A protein has these predicted regions:
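Domain-level detector for long C-terminal conserved domains
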Residues: 1-133
Length: 133
């Protein structure tokens, strides 16, 4: 259960679900998530939701509007919504591009981490940023 938090970050899970359970299964998961947010959201406190996912056709970015619909369906209001991207081509519709796609932590990441964990030097994700009240 989600209790006592006001920030939710979802990393590349949406595209996995999109492939595994399809659009209808993903809508059901979004519905479940939205209902749990309503049950566990702190009173009188906004909630920040940040979703990072693949920025390519028929992946997580295409399902972002489904999540927004479910948030509104359960009676929450979105006070802030931004769609962001790093790519300058074939990008997420309606999104704003970041000026730079270089990993801001690149100089701080030890070489062994880059090797062991395949740390990306450049970002190519699509982002949905929501403030829910």
């Amino acid at each position: 259960e989600i209790r006592g938090c006001n920030v939710i970050v979802i990393q590349y899970l949406i595209s996995f679900f999109y492939d595994a359970v399809g659009r209808n299964g993903l809508r059901r998961w979004f519905s479940y998530l939205a209902e749990n947010i309503v049950r566990n959201k702190l009173d009188n406190s906004p909630l920040l939701i940040i979703i990072n996912d693949a920025d390519s056709i028929n992946t997580g970015r295409d399902a972002f509007p489904l999540f927004v619909e479910e948030i509104e369906r359960v009676g929450l209001s979105i006070s802030y919504e931004r769609r962001r991207r790093f790519k300058d081509h074939n990008y997420y519709a309606g999104s704003l591009r970041y000026e730079n796609n270089q990993n801001v932590f690149e100089r701080e990441i030890p070489d062994r981490f880059v090797y062991d964990y395949c740390v990306a030097k450049y970002c190519e994700s699509a982002q949905l940023i929501l403030e829910v009240i």
